[in-house]
Regions:
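Conserved small/polar residues in nucleotide/adenosyl-binding loops
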Residues: 166-168
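Short glycine- and Lys/Arg-enriched binding-loop motifs that mark or flank ligand-binding interfaces
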Residues: 58, 64, 111, 115, ...
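Conserved oxyanion/phosphate-binding beta-strand-loop segments in alpha/beta enzyme cores
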Residues: 97-134
Length: 168
């Protein structure tokens, strides 16, 4: 059963189409299924990371905000965060302090936004500007690639984070 939950996003399109063919099912149940499947439409950007071979993939439902990126934030559960914590005790201590693996989006609005600067810089795909990469507790590891582009002018969580930690 765990595989079903892990792979649901791989089959989102087929599952959503299938809900339309469920004859005799209450509309309320079909709507609940559509919401649970939770397909997001957007765009993926690749940010080169200084001194790393692999780029950082960022999925966003707001590609129109790409030019306003102030920081990138990654979940403590990403592969990149794992690599960084093996080399840096301060990052390791921070990641062990926060565990957002079971966090839901509804919980994010209530909790304090905390993070730690990894010291890494990503290269903006259009402007070439260097952008700091943070490990943050408000990034969902199960959404997209577990990384986000911080655009404080267009997102309240990004704004709160940048105001308290980056001092914009």
């Amino acid at each position: 059963l765990k595989q079903w939950f892990l792979k649901i996003t791989d089959y989102a399109e087929e599952l959503l189409e299938g809900t339309d063919t469920l004859d005799g099912w209450p509309e309320q149940v079909k709507t609940m299924q559509r919401n649970w499947i939770g397909k997001s439409e957007g765009m993926e950007f690749l940010f080169r990371v200084e001194s790393h071979k692999e780029p950082l993939s960022i999925f966003t439902t707001r590609p129109d905000t790409i030019m306003g990126v102030t920081f990138l934030a990654i979940s403590p559960n990403t592969k990149l965060a794992g690599k960084l914590t093996t080399k840096n005790k301060e990052l390791e201590n921070f990641v062990s302090k926060i565990d957002n693996a079971k966090l839901k989006e509804a919980d994010l609005a209530q909790q304090e936004k905390i993070g730690i600067d990894t010291g890494l810089k990503a290269i903006h795909p259009f402007s070439g500007e260097k952008i700091p990469i943070w490990i943050a507790n408000f990034v969902l590891s199960g959404y997209g690639s577990g990384a986000l582009m911080g655009v404080p002018a267009h997102d309240q969580r990004d704004y709160e984070f940048a105001l308290s930690l980056i001092h914009i």
